[in-house]
């Protein structure tokens, strides 16, 4: 009887140990999905970054502080500014950015609102670039402006662990009054060209009859 009780106690103890071991393993092993990065802290201090795959941490000592999305994000910016020839325009720009894999910790610890900071840099860069150009030049050189803005903003965001992938200026819209004036000028130019072509056609007809 005593032997049976001893065996039962041993089995219970073994079961408890197995449960504890399994619990420790479950608390230790974690999987990082594709296009994510986990920041691990040890006793509340930064320890390391883990990328996609299966990893282990020390239970009750290490913890996953944050899960960072490594995909490319997009930010759209719209602002009003004035060109060199005093035309008010609404500029619409789009920029793509992502966390630099080599600076995941910097991106997390240094910048609380990356999209807000990026928006501020974009607006400042555009307000510096567009007023230096006439309306016609702004239209003609918008790709160059976008490239310069990308370089300027990219250098600023790199300090915080972010990479600016691509920046585009998708629209430069003059005020409605300017649009109306431009339409009138274009219409007058088209009418002038049409008149010239009609006169040329009549001249050719007269020569043909002669």
Model-derived segments and their meaning:
Residues 32, 40-49, 61-189:
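Amphipathic, interface-forming alpha-helical segments with heptad-repeat character
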Residues 55-61:
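Short linear S-[DN]-x-LW-Φ motif typified by the pepsin-like aspartic protease active-site region
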Residues 177-210:
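Long, charge-rich amphipathic alpha-helical coiled-coil "stalk/tentacle" segments
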